[in-house]
Regions:
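Acidic donor-binding segment of Leloir-type glycosyltransferases
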Residues: 5-49
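A structural helix-start
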Residues: 1-2
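Solvent-exposed polar/charged
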Residues: 10, 65-66
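Active-site acidic Asp-centered loop
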Residues: 23, 75-76, 84
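Short, acidic/glycine-rich phosphate-metal binding loop used to engage nucleotide
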Residues: 48-56
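Short beta-strand-to-loop acidic/aromatic patch adjacent to the donor-nucleotide binding site
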Residues: 69-80
Length: 193
């Protein structure tokens, strides 16, 4: 999370607010990393707490309620946006005023993955090692009470009428790197929801 927050504060506009929502079970190290940014003005940084309770939609809806801007770019703690995406996003939103939500391409990489893992999960892996690219994620949407998340896992956004896909180009991507141990742990957790 510290890497993401450092990156966002280096590349965001002053008028953009970063809202971090922490699960009540977050480790002391994660809390410490997030609290280290609390010297930022309130209109630029907000740290909140919410129990996940195995319900990602409810968790994301709580985050939405705590965002003050016109738009929400929901980024997971283990993701990082391409720098160009952050630079271009205000212009994309302004040029497409009727669009309410955007699908963002995501580059997934898993260190330590084997052919057995790929076959087991039915993944497609590119020559670059990108898994299931473009792995579209609905992550940019208007901050509107009528736009909300459903489903506890593999959540889906509802309430918007007009959407668009960003180009399936690395410049517009979220990066989602992990190792095989973390991937297996996440898959096991999702199976309990």
């Amino acid at each position: 999370i510290k890497k993401l927050l450092t990156f966002l504060f280096e590349h965001k506009r002053k008028e953009d607010q970063v809202v971090v929502q922490m699960d009540t079970s977050a480790t002391k190290e994660v809390w410490s990393a997030c609290e280290s940014f609390e010297g930022k003005p309130f209109d630029e940084y907000k740290l909140i707490e919410c129990a996940l309770n195995k319900n990602f939609a409810q968790y994301k809806n709580n985050l939405n309620k705590n965002c003050d801007g016109d738009w929400i770019f929901q980024i997971d703690a283990d993701e990082l946006p391409n720098e160009y995406l952050l630079e271009a996003l205000p212009f994309i939103l302004e040029a497409n005023a009727e669009t309410e939500a955007y699908w963002v391409p995501r580059v997934n990489t898993v260190a330590g993955i084997t052919e057995n893992h790929i076959a087991k999960w039915g993944w497609r892996v590119s020559d670059e090692g990108w898994i299931n690219f473009p792995d579209w994620q609905m992550r940019i949407y208007r901050n509107d009470e009528n736009i909300y998340w459903i489903k506890p896992v593999h959540e889906q956004l509802r309430g918007y009428t007009k959407f668009a896909n960003l180009p399936a180009d690395e410049s517009y991507c979220l990066y989602h790197p992990k190792n095989i141990g973390r991937q297996e742990t996440q898959n096991a957790f999702y199976d309990t929801i």
